[in-house]
């Protein structure tokens, strides 16, 4: 099955690579229209997925990611239309020169070819990834979480109908709808057809891909994000940022999971934090130093377990640790962070600059929420993933991250001397 999918995707990629920006946008507009026109089919399939997932004990955070509503589906269709408005990087001349030989040399952006994406139970990812791949002239093979099998099958069928109505092969967007995990291992060895693999999921999936894949892999999406509260912070303003970073949408990878508090401000900061977290329904997981002060406050508080510093809660839970100074905070982030998103709250710009320079994450913030790490917020449009590695992309992966480049030399029967 996967062999045939690979062949179809590779053949489709050749045709997609030749499309103009106008032709690609026409396809995307058709997809957006069809998602709305056939919304009942997709929503019915999703309702079955959600019912099964709930019966199987899936947590509320994951159920929230899985569920579609008419409003959410319309938002997904609107996101596809937004991709139409983004500048197409394909064909862009990055740089060029004329060599001493007279050869005109240029470096031009081109599609990668076929992208493979393994991702969690999030139906919007199916459409986001497909639209970005099509915009950049790439074919894509999708393998979503088993909880979304019906939703993904219905959504991809709608996308394929739109492709065919525009004269393009259905192989441009395909989904593996068999939940058999053995197919993931098979997919990891499809280097004959897939040019880049993006796993979005937990540490176990990332480890599997790194160890077994014969395809270049870009990992990301695991966000053990930190906020360091410096001693010079403005407490009221800091609390606004922390509430946003923790509670706006706890199930996302850019949500803060650990709060590091400078010991010199702990006495005044922790009571205010407890009050705010109680109002927000957040459970605090505190180290010994913080626990002594937080136990008298209104927020629910428990003693932190050592392993929780490495946890991505994806829920209304927040680690709180007292640190000696900026050096201590940076050391903690280096040991427990996932190089996703980390922030400092401070009025001391020297400390801010040190934090920016010394914290080696894909996104580092000064006096701002970690929730900004998002393709839409960065002006990139929908994102394929948030890469936490350094090659070939880092941070939110928009259109440019789905391209590579080729060198083109134009001569006049020019030969090398």
Curated annotation (Swiss-Prot):
Gene3D superfamilies xref list: Aldehyde Dehydrogenase, Chain A, domain 1, Aldehyde Dehydrogenase, Chain A, domain 2
One GO cellular component term: cytoplasm
Catalytic activity: L-glutamate 5-semialdehyde + phosphate + NADP(+) = L-glutamyl 5-phosphate + NADPH + H(+)
Subcellular locations according to the entry: Cytoplasm
InterPro entries for this protein: Ald_DH/histidinol_DH, Ald_DH_C, Ald_DH_N, Aldehyde_DH_dom, G-glutamylP_reductase_CS, Glu-5-SA_DH, GPR_dom
Primary location group: cytoplasm
Top EC group: oxidoreductase
Listed EC numbers: 1.2.1.41
Sample GO molecular function, one term: glutamate-5-semialdehyde dehydrogenase activity
Function: Catalyzes the NADPH-dependent reduction of L-glutamate 5-phosphate into L-glutamate 5-semialdehyde and phosphate. The product spontaneously undergoes cyclization to form 1-pyrroline-5-carboxylate.
Matches recorded under PANTHER family: DELTA-1-PYRROLINE-5-CARBOXYLATE SYNTHASE (PTHR11063:SF8), GLUTAMATE SEMIALDEHYDE DEHYDROGENASE (PTHR11063)
Protein's UniProt name: Gamma-glutamyl phosphate reductase
Gene source species: Escherichia coli (strain 55989 / EAEC)
Gene name as annotated: proA
């Amino acid at each position: 099955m996967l062999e045939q999918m690979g062949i179809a995707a590779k053949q489709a990629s050749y045709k997609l690579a030749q499309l103009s920006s106008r032709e690609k946008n026409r396809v995307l507009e058709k997809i957006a229209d069809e998602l709305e026109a056939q919304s009942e089919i997709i929503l019915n399939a999703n309702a079955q997925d959600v019912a099964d997932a709930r019966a199987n004990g899936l947590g509320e955070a994951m159920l929230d990611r899985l569920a579609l509503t008419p409003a959410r589906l319309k938002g997904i269709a609107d996101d596809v239309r937004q991709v139409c408005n983004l500048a197409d990087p394909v064909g862009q001349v990055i740089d060029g020169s004329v060599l001493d030989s007279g050869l005109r040399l240029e470096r031009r952006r081109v599609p990668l070819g076929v992208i493979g994406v393994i991702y969690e139970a999030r139906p919007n990812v199916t459409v986001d990834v497909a639209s970005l791949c099509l915009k950049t002239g790439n074919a894509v093979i999708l393998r979503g979480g088993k909880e979304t099998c019906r939703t993904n099958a219905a959504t991809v069928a709608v996308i394929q109908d739109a492709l065919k109505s525009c004269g393009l092969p259905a192989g441009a967007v395909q989904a593996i709808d068999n939940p058999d995990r053995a197919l993931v291992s098979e997919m990891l060895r499809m280097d004959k057809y897939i040019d880049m693999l993006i796993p979005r999921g937990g540490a176990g999936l990332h480890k599997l891909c790194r160890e077994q894949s014969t395809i270049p892999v870009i990992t990301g999406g695991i966000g053990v994000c930190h906020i360091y509260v410096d001693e010079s912070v403005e407490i009221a303003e800091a609390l606004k940022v922390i509430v946003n970073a923790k509670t706006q949408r706890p199930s996302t990878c850019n949500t803060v999971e650990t709060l590091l508090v400078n010991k010199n401000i702990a006495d005044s900061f922790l009571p205010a934090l407890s009050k705010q977290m109680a109002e927000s329904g957040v459970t605090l997981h505190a180290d010994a130093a913080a626990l002594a002060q937080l136990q008298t406050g209104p927020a629910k508080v428990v003693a932190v377990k050592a392993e929780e510093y490495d946890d991505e809660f994806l829920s209304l839970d927040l680690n709180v640790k007292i640190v000696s100074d900026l050096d201590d905070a940076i050391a903690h982030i280096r040991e427990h962070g996932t190089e996703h998103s980390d922030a400092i709250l401070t009025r001391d710009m020297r400390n801010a600059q040190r934090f920016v320079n010394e914290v080696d994450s894909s996104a580092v913030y000064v006096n701002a929420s970690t929730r900004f790490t998002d393709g839409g917020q960065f002006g990139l449009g929908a994102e394929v993933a948030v890469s936490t590695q350094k090659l070939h992309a880092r941070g939110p992966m928009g259109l440019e991250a789905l391209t590579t480049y080729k060198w083109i030399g134009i001569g006049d029967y020019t030969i090398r001397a």
